[in-house]
Amino acid sequence: MNATQEQLKIKLEQALVAAFGDEYAGVDPILVSASNPKFGDYQANVALSLSKKLGQQPRAIASAIVEKLDVSEICEKPEIAGPGFINLKLKTAYLEAQLNTIQADTRLGVPTAKHPQREIVDFSSPNIAKEMHVGHLRSTIIGDSIARILEFRGHDVLRLNHVGDWGTQFGMLITYLREVSPEALTTANALDIGDLVSFYRQAKQRFDADEAFQETARQEVVRLQAGAADTLHAWKLLCEQSRQEFQVIYDLLDVKLTERGESFYNPLLPTVVENLEKSGLLVENQGAKCVFLDGFTNREGEPLPLIVQKSDGGYNYATTDLAALRYRIQKDEAKRIIYITDAGQANHFAQFFQVARKAGWIPDDVELVHVPFGLVLGEDGKKFKTRSGDTVRLRDLLDEAISRAHADVEVRLKAEEREETAEFIDKVAEVVGISAVKYADLSQNRTSNYIFSYDKMLDLKGNTAPYMLYAYARIQGISRKGEINFADLGDNAKVILQHETEFALAKYLLQLGEVISTVEEDLSPNRLCEYLYELSKRFNAFYDRNQGVQVLSAEEPLRTSRLVLCDLTARTLKLGLSLLGIQVLERM
């Protein structure tokens, strides 16, 4: 809800009490944006909901409310429509004043949260000794965008990368490398990441087929857990090599993360089991220690357990996640913990959240949220793979997007008979390519699967990053053409609204705060994408040479007013795109 809606809501609540008495204090006036501009800007539907309780016709109730409603500073005279809708149309002077206010505000009228708090966003989380693949794309960019929005709202955000850096796979890999490439266990970067991944696959095949190898690998894990110097050194080298590779991707995506892998919580695992035992939740089942869950059953209808200690005394992902959760509440003092993973892990989160609640670890003021997302599909509608059937490496995917953007830029420059430096072309291609990949993902409802298409995401038309980047660059072109520095327009530059496209643009500019507040609450960045796309369309209609208005050639004070609208649009696009992790371009 934006500031204008907040004011109108309060005034409607006051009118309700004035019309029908104190017992109606706090009744929701059901104020919504009007579905059709011809009915005004907002519509209050409370009269229909009170008809039965008051024993009156909705129109009579609406009339009584309107009689006590004072919105003269904000709206034209309220109108009652249909069965009892109260329609409210914003005054032109009010709209102009609001725009002048946000013009002078670096935050464009978006307030910080009333109650800022410590929030943890757990995202990306690749595995050591494996390359980041297309499956990590969604978690990484959705998590980054959510973190950016929460930070902008003033929350203290801890961005955590829960990397898979511990467990059986290291015993397996170290055992295999001792045989085939021992120098990789003593010398930094003796292998490149591709070789490391290949050796990991070979080690897994040996582990699955060779019992003697299995036993040696398990002993290596025991040595790692005991802190044996040579094994620990090898583990650190492998982790550091993967970390360097991950950082190349994070730098390309402009993503900031604090790494805190599974190994961090390893010393805390016995305490988790001990605490659950003391609370009476642990049950021994076939030698394993587990907690039986409410609402989870197997095919036979029997309760499903969550295993927290295996029969051999080892731990698993659930134990680590429980330890991490306790630490984040007790030590990090988080009030909301947000996990960004694929929808396939929904049951896992529901299960260990339930165990933590049963154990009494979750205070009333702490919220746990799993943010699930769907799959990335190929254009054949199946899981996105390479032609050979392998998982798509994230680095390859990003490089391909940049390469295609590079080719598009060169074709466009040739068509326009424009010459630019190689440095300019490379910069534009990288920004457009990375932005296109990010925006194509973020603009989807995150719970849905989506089809990955380079052609669609790089299109200059439609709901794409290039369309948005072009709208921003177009406004900067107006500035250059008119030799105007928008920052020099000054506090005396006033907005004057006359043309219908100006009104449509102005009203939409004032909705930014409402949109960001919604994303903060429901953690769906696609809502911000939708807003920016609609804003770009409204700007293009405003600036259209046939249907829109003249800007640079207009007479004063309209010229300055329209330049302010251009500036506000550019600043809103830049801010909104930055919250999606997308960089703008002054020229394209």
From Swiss-Prot:
Family assignment from sequence similarity: Belongs to the class-I aminoacyl-tRNA synthetase family.
* HAMAP family from the UniProt entry: Arg_tRNA_synth (MF_00123)
Query: Keywords of this protein's UniProt record, alphabetized?
Result: Aminoacyl-tRNA synthetase, ATP-binding, Cytoplasm, Ligase, Nucleotide-binding, Protein biosynthesis
List, alphabetically, the CDD domains matched: Anticodon_Ia_Arg, ArgRS_core
Catalyses: tRNA(Arg) + L-arginine + ATP = L-arginyl-tRNA(Arg) + AMP + diphosphate
Alphabetized SUPFAM superfamilies for the sequence: Anticodon-binding domain of a subclass of class I aminoacyl-tRNA synthetases, Arginyl-tRNA synthetase (ArgRS), N-terminal 'additional' domain, Nucleotidylyl transferase
Transmembrane segment boundaries: none
Q: Which PANTHER family match?
A: ARGININE--TRNA LIGASE, CYTOPLASMIC, ARGINYL-TRNA SYNTHETASE
Localisation per UniProt entry: Cytoplasm
GO BP of this protein: arginyl-tRNA aminoacylation
Q: What's the short name of a Pfam family annotated to this entry?
A: DALR_1
Q: How does it assemble?
A: Monomer.
Tell me what organism the protein belongs to. Answer: Nostoc sp. (strain PCC 7120 / SAG 25.82 / UTEX 2576)
| UniProt EC number | 6.1.1.19
Record's protein name: Arginine--tRNA ligase
What is this enzyme's class at the first EC digit?
ligase
The UniProt entry's GO CC annotations, sorted and at most eight, read: cytoplasm
One GO molecular-function entry: ATP binding
* Motif position, 'HIGH' region: 126-136
